[in-house]
Amino acid sequence: MTITRKSHPLMKMINHAFIDLPAPSNISSWWNFGSLLGLCLMIQIASGLFLAMHYTSDTLTAFSSVAHICRDVNYGWLIRYIHANGASLFFVCLYLHIGRGIYYGSYMYKETWNIGIILLFLTMATAFMGYVLPWGQMSFWGATVITNLLSAIPYVGTNLVEWIWGGFSVDKATLTRFFAFHFILPFIIAAMAMVHLLFLHETGSNNPLGIPSNSDKIPFHPYYTTKDLLGIFILLAFFLTFVLFFPDLLGDPDNYSPANPLNTPPHIKPEWYFLFAYAILRSIPNKLGGVIALVLSILILALFPLLHTANQRSMMFRPISQILFWTLVSDLMILTWIGGQPVEPPFIVIGQVASILYFSIILILMPVAGLIENKLIKW
């Protein structure tokens, strides 16, 4: 008689995905971030659901409903801060996951990689709309500035912006629809994550060496279930410490003032996880050019499989590519810093140089480094 987990239609799927899945024996802790992202998504959906029970998506009551959650709802302050900082945790894991993919050449699984890029766009859209919901000053002005970027699209731009707003400015209609989309998108993200896994399990995981590991596989359970659990506990310990001791560290003080269309904050900026893209947007004086650069800064990830010139998949034994990779990481940190600074010298020039370097490393230097390393191997 077959074991239930191998014969039952539903259990069989779970078994193939999480129990009897053949996994490479040498994948490091960098491969933990997939499961950690799943955990982040579950935390966000659960905390968001409880927040939605008390939140009202009306311009007159949105701000006070958030205050009500923090003051009057049992542990409402905790749920609110878990949700707000959970978004930051989500993006930390997301960026580390993407960085791992770039370093070890995981982008060569094109379908998995492209679904991942779609997931990134969906997550960014969800986070942006969620930031608008508390209806504070930065919520309102962030929504106004970012949606206004679409007006740079020739011919249809203005109509498109007014269509998204549901009027001639960011108002009640905008807030209501943003709440509706913010609620539904995480479930779409969850569905896309399943597709992401489906494509991954077609090929199997990559590994640090970037070579086929079919000759040396181990079952996912108990080895990697235990390893994932360790990662989950470490992450939760760090996360809860952060939420309970520094809940407002990453937030903007302006968002504790109710939205006022008549008073513009001195520095309008998004949350920290969008600052690198915001810096690239601001580094181009032309509005349409800036918007194109902003979209390309993320969409450029789709070019990685096409720009891979090296004979080796992973960067583990490619020193020149390693230097370029860590330069890219440093460059992104500089862009993140610049995105939070006012538009004045010397920040303007630093932002422009960092933006040029960002695109140069990915489009020119990395492919050239791959070709040089191919030659070095033959010497």
Curated annotation (Swiss-Prot):
InterPro entries: Cyt_b/b6_C (IPR005798), Cyt_b/b6_C_sf (IPR036150), Cyt_b/b6_N (IPR005797), Cytb/b6-like_sf (IPR027387), Cytochrome_b (IPR030689), Cytochrome_b_C_euk/bac (IPR048260), Cytochrome_b_N_euk/bac (IPR048259), Di-haem_cyt_TM (IPR016174)
UniProt KW Cell wall biogenesis/degradation keyword: no
Binding sites annotated in the UniProt record for a ubiquinone: 201
Membrane spanning stretches: 33-53, 77-98, 113-133, 178-198, 226-246, 288-308, 320-340, 347-367
Membrane topology annotation: Multi-pass membrane protein
CDD domains: cytochrome_b_C, Cytochrome_b_N
Gene Ontology BP annotations: mitochondrial electron transport, ubiquinol to cytochrome c
Alphabetical keyword list: Electron transport, Heme, Iron, Membrane, Metal-binding, Mitochondrion, Mitochondrion inner membrane, Respiratory chain, Transmembrane, Transmembrane helix, Transport, Ubiquinone
Annotated GO MF terms: metal ion binding; ubiquinol-cytochrome-c reductase activity
Record note on quaternary structure: The cytochrome bc1 complex contains 11 subunits: 3 respiratory subunits (MT-CYB, CYC1 and UQCRFS1), 2 core proteins (UQCRC1 and UQCRC2) and 6 low-molecular weight proteins (UQCRH/QCR6, UQCRB/QCR7, UQCRQ/QCR8, UQCR10/QCR9, UQCR11/QCR10 and a cleavage product of UQCRFS1). This cytochrome bc1 complex then forms a dimer.
Name of the featured protein: Cytochrome b
Organism, as annotated: Chaetodipus baileyi (Bailey's pocket mouse)
Lineage of origin: Eukaryota, Metazoa, Chordata, Craniata, Vertebrata
Name of encoding gene: MT-CYB
